[in-house]
């Protein structure tokens, strides 16, 4: 929180006194969020590993995870009061190793990790809160797991992905964690996002989405 307040003050000075371009201001605000997310992820991972051990893939390799940013964060367009839209992704199914008392599947481990990251960022303290976190853009929204494996996430978009989810993925980017895993996801999801052909149902969904946007915008 102190880090965020310090740098938001610096950005505010650049914005108001030095009259820097809007693109530079929103980019700097987004960078502060990226660093804050990385620090929160590392702290949460340390806490979880001390309790449950280190998550591993079924191959025996240590598991990797990445936080993906959507919307204004993904597009490096955050303003001073923006929520941050996030999705948590890990590389493969498996379980924790290193603690005899309690072994967790990677599903359970990363769900707890997400909860801890959100707590660190959004709990009110004497210094306020760092960020309001929104996880609703993840597959299945509030009904879905807090974190998914790469394979499960790709399977969801391939079979159940909606038009609005395709649009949301246009601005997504890795913001913390294993950037290479995030880039692997971006490459794999590209055929879904930039589909060459649309079926009738998808075209109708686009038309319906356009009508909803126009209705909300008013006359």
Please state what every model-predicted region is:
Residues 1-219:
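A nucleotide- and high-energy phosphate-metabolite-utilizing enzyme signature
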């Amino acid at each position: 929180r102190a880090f965020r307040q310090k740098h938001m003050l610096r950005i505010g000075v650049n914005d108001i006194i030095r009259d820097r371009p809007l693109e530079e201001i929103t980019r700097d605000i987004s960078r502060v969020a990226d660093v804050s997310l990385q620090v929160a992820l590392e702290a949460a991972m340390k806490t979880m590993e001390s309790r449950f051990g280190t998550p591993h893939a079924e191959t025996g390799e240590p598991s990797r995870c990445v936080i993906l940013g959507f919307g204004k964060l993904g597009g490096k367009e955050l303003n001073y009061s923006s929520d941050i839209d996030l999705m948590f992704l890990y590389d493969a199914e498996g379980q924790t190793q290193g603690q005899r008392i309690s072994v967790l599947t990677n599903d359970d481990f990363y769900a707890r990790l997400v909860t801890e990251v959100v707590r660190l960022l959004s709990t009110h303290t004497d210094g306020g809160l760092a960020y309001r976190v929104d996880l609703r853009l993840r597959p299945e929204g509030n009904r879905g797991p807090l974190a998914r494996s790469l394979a499960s996430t790709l399977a969801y978009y391939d079979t159940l992905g909606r038009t609005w989810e395709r649009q949301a993925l246009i601005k997504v980017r890795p913001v913390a964690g294993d950037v290479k895993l995030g880039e692997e996801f971006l490459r794999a999801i590209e055929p879904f996002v930039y589909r060459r052909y649309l079926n009738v149902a998808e075209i109708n969904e686009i038309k319906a989405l356009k009508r909803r946007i126009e209705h909300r915008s008013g006359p």
